[in-house]
């Protein structure tokens, strides 16, 4: 009898061991398959649907290929035509960029102002020079605008490196550099290119030194284009078709701009067909260009990933609130705080707070963690939110966690660490699920476009009073061209073109929308 019991017991244990081994084997196989599919998905995602090239060393710029691990896959896919155009541009930049014989020859003509460059061959290499002016948000928007203009006109874009641009962004083009060499012949003159400069296009038109309507104009070796918010009607002629015909012949263009002027490029007839092929979804222009161009350096990427992993990654939902106060003096204002609360609670982005614990009737219904990222020069806005959700329970039972990475008090453009913090915060905002931005803020424009987010825009307060309604949901994620040329050669097109509209936060501005 004992022998029988022993045999039965052994058989039972053997079957259990076999079953366990079978389950372990299946689990390992499933895990390997799952990991394999994850790895495959990651390898596809890291190039963002072909937007990025694989021709870079990954360690030199971690953010380029790691960003897809921190961001939900974009529902907006780049067109094949855009992908092809970017690869063609990269090859052109290699042939014409700094250090090439073509670049050397192109710089040599800058000293010969007495020659008419409409009759001289400069080959395939023509250039755009970007001058760094105003704050980081403005700079990113103008870089995107200039790069698109470079794509449309087959030019090479080179950026002024006398500021901290190389401390913020990796090189975007493989096997070459986008940095304007410090020995560029016009370096000492770049800061003097203002709206009164005799080499700026608007001034030359005003002084009859150049004429876009005749074929008799002498084409200079370079022109300054002044597209700052205070530009005049002569400067705005840049957006006219006949003027573009003349400007295309100039070998070097130096841009002084603080505006996102892409919407008005769509209203230039000769560009419209090409733009439609590049961006069938018109509100994706900045979204695609930003993800292609702007990859934070490893130092900035470290700031971003540490903040994300420490404060945002565990949340079930992430909300970004970008607060920019344009009042003078700026700082904390109660009416701005009231407006933030009115907007976020009315739009169900944040729950209300109960005074008494007993008012919460459904605490088990939702124990979701909602992380709220606040970016502001001032600490008071996030601190009041933090205290509010600490003192009383939320009406939904959600746990609300408030995080503000920095409180700089003053904007310190061209201070390396300040700008790096600003870029990190822009990027963190773009990683949220929903975003609230401030009226006319370029900082917010960049974050929403990079993240593919349609923001709730806080209207600008008047007379120190919270506006009613406090905010509006944007129609598209595109930034606003805050000072668009609404009159002159584009006046009629503004009103009849279905894919441009006046901005929600600036009646003098234009933005791109999908016409449907």
Curated annotation (Swiss-Prot):
Keywords assigned: Cell wall biogenesis/degradation, Glycoprotein, Glycosyltransferase, Golgi apparatus, Membrane, Signal-anchor, Transferase, Transmembrane, Transmembrane helix
Taxonomy, superkingdom: Eukaryota
Glycosylated position list: 35, 116, 211, 362, 463
GO cellular component terms given for this protein: Golgi cisterna membrane
Gene3D superfamilies (alphabetical): 3.40.50.11340
Biological pathway: Protein modification; protein glycosylation
GO molecular function terms listed in the Swiss-Prot or TrEMBL record: galactoside 2-alpha-L-fucosyltransferase activity
Compartment(s): Golgi apparatus, Golgi stack membrane
Similarity field: Belongs to the glycosyltransferase 37 family.
GO biological process entries: cell wall biogenesis; cell wall organization; protein glycosylation
Membrane-crossing segments per the record: 5-25
Enzyme class, first EC level, given as a word: transferase
Tissues where this protein is expressed: Expressed in leaves and stems.
Organism from which the protein derives: Arabidopsis thaliana (Mouse-ear cress)
Record's bilayer topology term: Single-pass type II membrane protein
Keyword Glycosyltransferase attached: yes
Protein name (database record): Probable fucosyltransferase 8
Lumenal side: 26-516
EC numbers on record: 2.4.1.-
């Amino acid at each position: 009898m004992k022998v029988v019991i022993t045999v039965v017991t052994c058989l039972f244990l053997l079957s259990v061991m076999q079953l366990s081994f079978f389950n372990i084997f299946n689990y390992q196989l499933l895990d390997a398959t799952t990991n394999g599919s994850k790895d495959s998905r990651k390898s596809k995602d890291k190039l963002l649907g072909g937007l990025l090239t694989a021709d870079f060393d990954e360690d030199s710029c971690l953010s380029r290929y790691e960003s897809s691990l921190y961001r939900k896959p974009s529902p907006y896919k780049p067109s094949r035509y855009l992908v092809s155009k970017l690869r063609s541009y990269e090859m052109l930049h290699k042939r014409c960029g700094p250090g090439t014989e073509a670049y050397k020859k192109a710089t040599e003509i800058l000293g010969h102002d007495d020659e008419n460059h409409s009759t001289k061959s400069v080959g395939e290499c023509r250039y755009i020079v970007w001058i760094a002016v105003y704050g980081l948000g403005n700079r990113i928007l103008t870089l995107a605008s200039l790069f698109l203009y470079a794509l449309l006109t087959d030019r090479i874009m080179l950026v002024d490196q006398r500021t901290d641009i190389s401390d913020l962004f990796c090189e975007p083009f493989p096997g070459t550099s986008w940095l304007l060499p410090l020995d560029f012949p016009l370096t000492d003159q770049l800061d003097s290119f203002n709206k009164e400069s005799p080499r700026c296009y608007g001034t030359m038109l005003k002084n009859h030194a150049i004429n876009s309507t005749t074929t008799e104009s002498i084409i200079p070796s370079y022109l300054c284009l002044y597209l700052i918010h205070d530009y005049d009607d002569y400067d705005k002629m840049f957006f006219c078709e006949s003027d573009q015909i003349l400007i295309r012949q100039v070998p070097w263009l130096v841009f002084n701009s603080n505006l996102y002027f892409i919407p008005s490029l769509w209203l230039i007839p000769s560009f419209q067909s090409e733009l439609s092929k590049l961006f069938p979804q018109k509100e994706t222009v900045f979204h695609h260009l930003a993800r292609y161009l702007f990859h934070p350096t490893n130092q900035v990427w470290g700031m971003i990933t540490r903040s994300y992993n420490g404060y945002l990654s565990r949340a079930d939902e992430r909300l970004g609130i970008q607060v920019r106060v344009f009042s003078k003096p700026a700082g904390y204002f109660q009416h701005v705080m009231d407006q933030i609360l009115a907007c976020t609670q009315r739009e169900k982005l944040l729950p209300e707070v109960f005074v008494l614990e007993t008012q919460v009737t459904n605490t088990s219904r939702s124990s979701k963690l909602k992380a709220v990222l606040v970016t502001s020069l001032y600490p008071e806005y996030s601190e009041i939110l933090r205290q509010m959700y600490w003192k009383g329970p939320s009406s939904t039972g959600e746990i609300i966690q408030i995080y503000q990475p920095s409180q700089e008090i003053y904007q310190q453009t061209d201070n390396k660490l300040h700008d790096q913090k600003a870029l990190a915060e822009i990027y963190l905002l773009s990683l949220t699920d929903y975003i609230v931005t401030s009226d006319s803020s370029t900082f917010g424009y960049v974050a929403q476009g990079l993240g593919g987010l349609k923001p709730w825009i806080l209207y600008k307060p008047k007379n120190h009073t919270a506006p009613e309604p406090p905010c509006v949901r944007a129609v598209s994620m595109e930034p606003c061209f805050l000072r668009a040329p609404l009159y002159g050669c584009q006046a009629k097109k503004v009103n009849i073109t279905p894919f441009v509209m006046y901005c929600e936060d600036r009646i003098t501005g234009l933005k791109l929308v999908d016409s449907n």
